[in-house]
Amino acid sequence: MIQQNINTIVGSLPQHVRLVAVSKYHPIEKIREAYAAGQRLFGESRANELREKAMLMPSDTEWHFIGHLQKNKVKTVVPIVSMIHSIDSLALMMEIERQTAKFVDERVVRGLSPRIKVLLQLHVAKEETKFGFTIGELRGMLDGGLWREFKHVEMAGLMCMATHTDDREEIRREFQFAKTCFDEIRQEYFSVDGNFRECSWGMTDDYPIALDCGSTMVRVGSGIFGQREY
């Protein structure tokens, strides 16, 4: 079933869009089944769970951290992941810069770049519980310019999560707003930086809409693995 799900989803994605298999809360056996089906990129949202699973998977498995990241967990995450999707403050980015500098050798041994890629999380949903910058906050942070001094953090694009709703047009409006913000931010701050190119939005229930709105990376969990096991 997992192999069939992956084949169906991958077959529906444009060639330039990557599938992040959201493996959080799922047992290692299911992750291995997805790996056997050809999936190599997995997303986790808990630092300790990520570390435990990474130790049990082949070395060519790629890991992204996709959940809210507390600063005290950064040192656990940065030796393992190629990308962090959930940057919601300058302070978090500064801690990632500091910790990644300490783990450069370990990252290289794992086949990772000395620089860790990050996505800036944009708050587009109606729920106040979701994290992320408003577009005003994001511009303020970028205008400050401190991020330009980072040597171990590479800004790779934006991430967002839509409102949890059955209103498909609301979801489309939110994703389209995120794409507009991405285009403006890239033009204003990253016009000479070809690395700022990722749009991470779309999950199991809404990724087809996300694809219409410029997504380059979809995060699918239950659509691959079934319901979570807590």
Range-by-range predicted roles:
Residues 1-205, 211-213, 225-227:
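Conserved alpha/beta-domain cores
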